[in-house]
Amino acid sequence: MVVLDASIVNIALPSMQVDLGISDADRQWVITAYTLAFGGLLLLGGRIADYAGRKKMFIIGLIGFAFASFLGGLAQTSGTLFAARALQGVFAAILAPAALSLISVTFTDSKERAKAFGVYGALSGGGAAIGLVLGGILTEYANWHWTLLVNVPIAIIAVILAIPFVRESRATGDTKYDIPGAITATLGLVSLVYGITKAESEGWNGTQTILFMGAGLVLLAIFLI
């Protein structure tokens, strides 16, 4: 679902834009809101999964991802859709590393583990292509809402199977989380990208362009320091 959702809405973007009145400049936030939240919180999500419990965070990630998908699928405004996509990214940042960690601890034999990671890699690699095809089919024969709602039954099935078949595990040691750092990096990326998008309408010398790009660079510099 994590990889699938990075591409499944691409074909549906024109329909979303017309239905929700999204401007050309803001249309990319359907994609960007998801990828920024996912990428910005991925390391933090992996650390939380390792120490809070991989199975628990995997299930929480699935439920949260399903809820965000449901919220986005029912969106009637662009703001709701953007927020839902960002929320999907947040829970994807928990779900993806938890899934990888579970594979690592479940398959202790090196050969079996290699096979499991091979299957995971194949599914992840094909997920983007499948997302484009599935997004086109759902948009053509249903509507764009289903490009998000399709995640709900998938997540429900995954939760039902995970509860009895996946065993809990967690790492030991230092459990400190760099939450301020993750938030700073994510906000910096969002501000920087937003400033770049404003350049299309206001120009590179526009007040908002300079303000948001400057704020983004400052936040990223703080994160690196």
Q: What are these regions, as identified by a protein language model?
A:
Residues 1-164:
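Transmembrane-helix bundle of Major Facilitator Superfamily
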Residues 118, 140-225:
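Hydrophobic transmembrane-helix bundles of small-molecule transporters
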